[in-house]
Regions:
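Membrane-interfacial helix-loop-helix
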Residues: 1-27, 52-136, 140-143, 147, ...
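Transmembrane alpha-helix interface/packing and boundary motifs in multi-pass membrane proteins
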Residues: 26-47
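Transmembrane alpha-helical segments of integral membrane proteins
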Residues: 159-171
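Hydrophobic alpha-helical transmembrane bundles that constitute the permease/transmembrane domains
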Residues: 129-133, 153, 157-160
């Protein structure tokens, strides 16, 4: 079944950057980092491509300004997820599965919390889906707020600087990389799919072991 046009657009990083610029990038990052129904949005490769487009001059903003805006969006998105989990988390766990919500995503994230503790708030920045649900689950378990914000800020900074910064480096030094955007997206999609499937299988294995 073909995806609706608006959903296809929201999952196309290149189109997001070319059409909406930094404003739309920030909105996507905000949503993907804390709104449970936005877990499918592009994250890692959107940040990398934002850096590439900034480095090649297609995205006409300075690198520091872009990093600051995306970092702020990531932190605020996770904060929103934390507050949602704290006040409405119980309703979310009782919510039936749908296209934009799967209970298995919460369980996968819960297993990461059991294994890594609060450090998952840093690790999860580089794990699609878990990145969306980690702050929500933090709120659900009433994680100490200053503790949450510390890991939120550190994780957000590492995620944005490493991905967008490396994208800028390649875009500035190798402008021709812009002709291989689709291959970059395919690479990130492959890594993302592998990571998500592996995380889900590990979570199921650990749940059965209990």
């Amino acid at each position: 079944m073909a995806l609706p046009d608006w959903l296809t657009f929201l999952t196309d990083s290149e189109e997001i950057i070319r059409t909406g610029g930094l404003i739309l990038i920030c909105l996507i990052v905000f949503a993907e980092n804390g709104l449970f129904f936005a877990f499918f949005l592009p994250g890692d490769y959107l940040l990398f491509l934002a850096g590439v487009f900034c480095g090649t001059g297609i995205l006409t903003v300075s690198l520091p300004f872009m990093l600051f805006c995306i970092f702020g969006s990531a932190v605020l998105g996770s904060l929103t997820g934390y507050l949602f989990g704290k006040f409405f988390g119980g309703r979310l766990e009782n919510r039936p599965d749908s296209l934009f919500f799967k209970k298995k995503n919460i369980e996968t994230t819960r297993q990461y919390f059991l294994k890594y503790g609060s450090r998952v708030l840093i690790i999860s920045r580089f794990l699609p889906v878990v990145r969306t649900f980690a702050p929500i689950l933090s709120g659900m378990i009433k994680l100490d707020f200053p503790h949450f914000m510390t890991y939120n800020v550190i994780g957000g900074a590492l995620w944005v600087v490493l991905l967008s910064g490396s994208g800028f480096y390649f875009g500035e030094r190798f402008p021709g990389i812009i002709n291989y955007v689709h291959y970059i997206i395919l690479f990130f999609l492959a890594v993302t799919t592998f990571t998500v499937v592996r995380a889900y299988l590990n979570a199921r294995k650990e749940m059965k072991a209990e």
